[in-house]
Amino acid sequence: MQPGGAPDMSALLAQAQQMQQQLMAAQAQIAAAEVTGESGGGLVRITGKGSGEVTSVQIDPKIVDPEDVETLQDLIIGALADLTSKTQELASQRLGPLAGGLGDLGGGLGLPGV
């Protein structure tokens, strides 16, 4: 704070720039991270990147039954849902600490959301 109680704008700007760099680094880590979702106790595994790109699908041959395609479809949907959930959890873990720092950014200005 400067004399008279005014916030130091250069310090606020420096803090905002530092947080932006940390956010960009965390987003890059998330996008590059490999996440695997599974269902049926690992019978169906879907691997993807934090960016949302699916990179592989593995299906245990013992569950491939031409007479029961519906079960396989359900397992694939379950594995995709698990992949999505794990990707969101990864993003929360990486971005959560950065979001916590936003509370200090307003410097007591009473700005909404900071």
Swiss-Prot record:
Q: Where in the cell is it found?
A: Cytoplasm, Nucleoid
| Keyword Cytoplasm among record annotations | yes
Q: What is its main location?
A: cytoplasm
Listed GO cellular component terms?
bacterial nucleoid; cytosol
Q: Which Pfam families match?
A: YbaB_DNA_bd
This entry's Gene Ontology molecular function terms read: DNA binding
Q: Which UniProt keywords apply?
A: Cytoplasm, DNA-binding
| InterPro entries noted in UniProt | YbaB-like_sf (IPR036894), YbaB/EbfC (IPR004401)
Could you tell me what this protein does? Binds to DNA and alters its conformation. May be involved in regulation of gene expression, nucleoid organization and DNA protection.
Q: Could you say which protein family the record assigns here?
A: Belongs to the YbaB/EbfC family.
User: Quaternary state and partners of this protein?
Assistant: Homodimer.
* Name the UniProt record assigns to this protein: Nucleoid-associated protein MAB_0319
